Amino acid sequence: MYFPVFTQIEGKRFLIMGGGKVAARKVHTLLQYGADIVVIAKKVCDEIKEVLPEKSIFEDFIKNAESDFLEKEIQKAVLVVAATSSREENHRVAELCHAYHILVNVADSEAESSFIFPSVVRKGNISIGINSGTGSPAVSKQIRCQIEKAVPDYYADIAIFMGELRQYVKANFEEEAMRRYILKTAAAKAFSKERVLTENEIKEIIRQGQND
């Protein structure tokens, strides 16, 4: 069973083993969150070459695999994805990662994976990760579609607004109870109105909190 964790990956080094369609999907996903990606593969597809700089791509997999190059690259990485077309190579990468306590996702073996890519719903800064727990991407996809319908776009605007309001409240109100009142009341009103609150509406919430 996997525990859902959101981690900061911006600027962190990811090693992708493989250069095909599966690897390209992983690269696309990770780039959205600012990861520093290196790809090692026998052949790298155009989708990857179009989005990564040449220095981040090593396209002579056979030569690299026969040297200690791969092992050194794994040790540099925070997370590794094994997405080659070879079961043997994916298994080898997984074993090296486990030996060095590096988290690895193995595209063709969830049993060898120490982390997985969830199905993700993203609305602005809001990210919702989904794992069905069944090993079935089709189930996760259906759940994702239902959540996408249930989460309107204005949620993203409210999330940004509440983040900014939280910083303002922390800087201007010392009493914890008052902070909680303002933020809880503002969030409830914003979602009920389905929009960001106006400055006057915030002032009214603060006034009510001070009078209670």
State each model region's role.
Residues 79-85, 90-117:
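ADP-ribose/adenylate-binding Rossmann-like module
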Residues 1-43, 47-51:
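Hydrophobic, well-ordered beta-alpha structural blocks that scaffold small-molecule cofactor pockets
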Residues 20-22, 87-88, 134:
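Residue-level detector of alpha-helix initiation sites
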Residues 106-155:
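E1/E1-like adenylate-forming module used to activate ubiquitin-like modifiers
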Residues 58-75:
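Glycine-rich, highly charged phosphate/nucleotide-binding loops
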Residues 134-212:
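An accessory alpha-helical subdomain
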Residues 11, 75-76, 123:
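Alpha-helix C-terminal capping/helix-to-coil transition sites in glycosyltransferase folds
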